[in-house]
């Protein structure tokens, strides 16, 4: 190889491309420097700590990826391989070299006695741990991956909570009042009995708001409740109906704003200048952190539990619950080095997420989709494999809603990631099929969007112009340009040219966009009923982002009550056992609204910790 320092770019997580500098001698890799400033914070931190050193020490590219950060790990290896090729070396030979030797040690045993043990260090687990520490409890956290965060790190960021005093500062958008009118006109007999009184109260709120002529953004806990309930009310393939348990939905919407305030008190900074709406949220009530994505929550909570004395054991997989006389009294786990860990605790929290990264398990339980492909992509962390659900079953926990799987309609068609391309608020979505035609109300629920996309063959495109581009989440112009250069995002000066690049008929795409623009002007979409379109698509350059549904959220899980107790098959509390977040079921029922997951994990994680502290001293 020709000695020198080579500058390359490697694919990171999401839309980022990581600049790298690789210094080579004529026969060795001497140094690897990665500029990860554009990488998704919290997902691949351990990659940049471990992998370059492992490659340099072992003088091989045959290295294992870092658990939970496969894409970034492959990106680092690929970047070094590119540098070797540029230097005239044989990258394939480096990839075929022996793996670095792993030091072995005799099996160890660790034992802990504590007040609280938390299994899974995503948002729900860290919320439970933080709140337990606020109650002066001793806390042990078990996380099977090298770093904290779980799926929460990958979340888009907006957290649903009705906050009418704040929302009054924002103007109502064209069509939002029509959405409220349609909701209020829902026949009462279509509302399940336990929700009817609240629905009638909501009707009166909407009637009063419309009659007042107010032009501000309306919201209330009741609107959030009824949208969550109706948004999750579904039938499976056999015609069995499911909807969210009233007490769980009520607890969520009545406590979500307190969760936002609690997080703010801990140090999470929210952008008060913008009320946002993730895809499939149905309403603008999202509290968006200033920092990008879910890392805004994870680093604050992670730092807080560390600073306040939690014992954090990463790369430690919980394998069994300890049971005594029908009560859960702790966990048995193993570290990746073989060390056996036994934690005895007064309170055990299962917060290990759902099973969206376990395709065979998804296929086993699915009763909602006609077919789940073996090679379907997922938006999930590889950690999300159903571990906490299996642990709960050991204690006799009831499962609920397991057949309902949410597909994220606007995922990367190759990786399943959320934030490649131009991912905007759904008010700015223009979804077109491979013929260049719109095919759905872009404001609809996620399962509706995913089903419509599947009916079109799966692959579709989000069309944007320069103004819509400015509303995209979690990206930069540098990243956009890099994706255009890589051929994963398409850009053109005219719609006709853009159509040619993605294989559409130019006249069809132009006609579609012209009609869409006219609907924005009119405030009414006669084709698909999209009620709130923010921007027209008319300012060059134009973009097409390829999208395809991927597994996103598993609504089912352990049955819980409103206090976070795990319930058995007779709906009795399992003493000492609590759950929250995607590990639990019963809240979202058949479909989860965008932005409700963050409200869920922080609300039920926090409240379950309050319950445990009160019950277990």
Swiss-Prot record:
L.fermentum strain NBRC 3956 is significantly more abundant in subjects with type 2 diabetes (T2D) compared with subjects with normal glucose tolerance (NGT). This is Urocanate reductase. FAD binds at residues 124, 143, 151-152, 156-157, 387, 553, 582, 598. GO terms for cellular component: membrane. It comes from Limosilactobacillus fermentum (strain NBRC 3956 / LMG 18251). The modification FMN phosphoryl threonine is found at residue 70. Its cofactor is FAD; FMN. Belongs to the FAD-dependent oxidoreductase 2 family. FRD/SDH subfamily. Binds 1 FAD per subunit. Binds 1 FMN covalently per subunit. The keyword Glycoprotein does not apply. GO terms for molecular function: FMN binding; steroid dehydrogenase activity, acting on the CH-CH group of donors. Catalyzes the two-electron reduction of urocanate to dihydrourocanate (also named imidazole propionate or deamino-histidine). Dihydrourocanate is present at higher concentrations in subjects with type 2 diabetes, and directly impairs glucose tolerance and insulin signaling at the level of insulin receptor substrate (IRS) through activation of p38 gamma (MAPK12)-p62-mTORC1. Therefore, the UrdA enzyme from the gut bacteria L.fermentum strain NBRC 3956 may contribute to the pathogenesis of type 2 diabetes by producing the microbial metabolite dihydrourocanate. InterPro entries: FAD-dep_OxRdtase_2_FAD-bd, FAD-oxidoreductase_2, FAD/NAD-bd_sf, FMN-bd, Succ_DH/fumarate_Rdtase_cat_sf. It catalyses: dihydrourocanate + A = urocanate + AH2. Its EC number is 1.3.99.33. The active site is at 446 (proton donor). The keyword Lyase does not apply. Keywords: FAD, Flavoprotein, FMN, Oxidoreductase, Phosphoprotein. It is an enzyme of class 1 (oxidoreductase). Pfam families: FAD_binding_2, FMN_bind.
